[in-house]
């Protein structure tokens, strides 16, 4: 029998030490990984609730187990809030992750061997958009488009040429490292020209879309997916959205359950419901605008300090810094910044001479630092510190000096006050 007073402390101190160390790292380090953010304590409360005990295979009102009358209400709240937030007619809140959501879309709307046209991972796309190492690149005939290496922008004429040439069943629009605004009307035009479905993965910019600061793909896409963390600041999970289409809705539901998953994670769905409610609050737009302002301010500093920012700047929450001209690797830069308590991720850049495990670039994003309360002033200072480390890569004194300043800044802007 369990007690309400049961705690990890005193029972599994080795695990607790690792958990506490990670929480302290989050407080003491500046987080600039574009896909990371901090959830509210409300989201954490939902995820740590008794809902974790409930199995609920199926959908609200159509479960395979009894005792689901309360979790039905939880899922219904999440669905309705997601639809309201994005102007969707359909929402499935059960995918365990963004990759799970993408896999369900492919399972629902494609047959093995069908052709998909997606953005190359090497040019800013995502693994699930047809990369050879992903199931999306193994189960389907994946053709890849990229960016114009001179402008750093997607070449839509090239996308159209490839579409006409390969006649894809589906075109995938989305990215993990592209800093400019996607042209959804143009993607729709290309898809219609070749009779393809248009699938948009807006995982990185969903928060900006919800705030009205980035174009909403719903009017143009046959189906849209997103994660619920990143710019949405919710729990780690996935979401599928669409406009009204009974045939597609049935296929999507069947692909998620029983096609790809069994029981949904009801405690995570509750966390999603909380984050959707938070995103509907008036202050959410101001937060997202600050995310963009901070990213643009940081990118400007890198450009002024002589670093190449792919695409020449950013319209969203992230940007990619190429270190090719400096002869540096992303791996070494990532490690040096980590020693100064600044967390980024190494990232491939167009025409990268290095392997994906070394790379010649850094991806930098501002959602997490903005959640901490950083404004443009702090972000400009932070970008300067990063450039100082890159200018003097491997200099322990520079790293120590920056680490000391990072410590003071983190103390002024705690994650949880």
Swiss-Prot record:
Record gene name: glyA3
Function: Catalyzes the reversible interconversion of serine and glycine with tetrahydrofolate (THF) serving as the one-carbon carrier. This reaction serves as the major source of one-carbon groups required for the biosynthesis of purines, thymidylate, methionine, and other important biomolecules. Also exhibits THF-independent aldolase activity toward beta-hydroxyamino acids, producing glycine and aldehydes, via a retro-aldol mechanism.
Entry similarity comment: Belongs to the SHMT family.
Domain of life: Bacteria
An annotated GO cellular component: cytosol
Keyword NADP: no
Ligand binding ((6S)-5,6,7,8-tetrahydrofolate): 121, 125-127, 355-357
EC number annotated for this UniProt entry: 2.1.2.1
Protein name per the record: Serine hydroxymethyltransferase 3
UniProt catalytic activity: (6R)-5,10-methylene-5,6,7,8-tetrahydrofolate + glycine + H2O = (6S)-5,6,7,8-tetrahydrofolate + L-serine
Organism of provenance: Pseudomonas fluorescens (strain Pf0-1)
PROSITE patterns from the UniProt entry: SHMT (PS00096)
Keyword set includes NAD: no
Pathway field: One-carbon metabolism; tetrahydrofolate interconversion; Amino-acid biosynthesis; glycine biosynthesis; glycine from L-serine: step 1/1
């Amino acid at each position: 029998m369990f007690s309400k007073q049961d705690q990890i402390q005193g029972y599994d101190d080795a695990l607790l030490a690792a958990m506490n160390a990670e929480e302290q790292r989050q407080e003491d380090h500046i987080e600039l990984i574009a896909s990371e953010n901090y959830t509210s304590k409300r989201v954490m409360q939902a995820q740590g609730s008794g809902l974790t005990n409930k199995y609920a295979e199926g959908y609200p009102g159509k479960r395979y187990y009894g005792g689901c009358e309360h979790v039905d209400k939880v899922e219904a709240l999440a669905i309705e809030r997601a639809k309201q937030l994005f102007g969707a007619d359909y929402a499935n809140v059960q995918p365990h992750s963004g990759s799970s959501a993408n896999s369900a879309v492919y399972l629902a709307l494609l047959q093995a061997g069908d052709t998909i046209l997606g953005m190359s991972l090497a040019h800013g796309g995502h693994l699930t958009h047809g990369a050879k190492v992903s199931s999306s690149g193994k189960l389907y005939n994946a053709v890849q488009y990229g960016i114009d290496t001179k402008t750093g922008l997607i070449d839509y004429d090239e996308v159209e040429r490839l579409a006409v040439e390969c006649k894809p069943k589906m075109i995938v629009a989305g990215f993990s490292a592209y800093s400019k605004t996607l042209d959804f009307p143009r993607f729709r035009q290309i898809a219609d020209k070749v009779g393809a479905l248009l699938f948009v993965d807006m995982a990185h910019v969903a928060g900006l879309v919800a705030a009205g600061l980035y174009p909403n793909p719903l009017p143009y896409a046959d189906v849209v997916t997103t994660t619920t963390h990143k710019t949405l600041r919710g729990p780690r999970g996935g979401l599928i959205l669409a406009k009204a289409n009974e045939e597609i809705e049935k296929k999507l539901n069947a692909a998620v359950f029983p096609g790809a998953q069994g029981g949904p994670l009801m405690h995570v769905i509750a966390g999603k419901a909380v984050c959707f409610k938070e995103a509907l609050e008036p202050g959410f737009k101001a937060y997202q605008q600050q995310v963009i302002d901070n990213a643009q301010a940081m990118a400007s500093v890198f450009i002024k300090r002589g670093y190449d920012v792919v695409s020449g700047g950013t319209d969203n929450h992230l940007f990619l810094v190429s270190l090719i001209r400096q002869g540096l690797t992303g791996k070494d830069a990532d490690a040096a910044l980590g020693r100064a308590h600044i967390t980024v991720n190494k990232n491939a850049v167009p025409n990268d001479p290095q392997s994906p495990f070394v790379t010649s670039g850094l991806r930098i994003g501002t959602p997490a630092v903005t959640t901490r309360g950083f404004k443009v002033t702090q972000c400009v200072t932070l970008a300067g510190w990063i450039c100082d480390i890159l200018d003097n890569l491997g200099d322990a004194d520079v790293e120590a000096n920056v680490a000391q300043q990072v410590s003071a800044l983190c103390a002024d802007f705690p994650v949880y006050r």
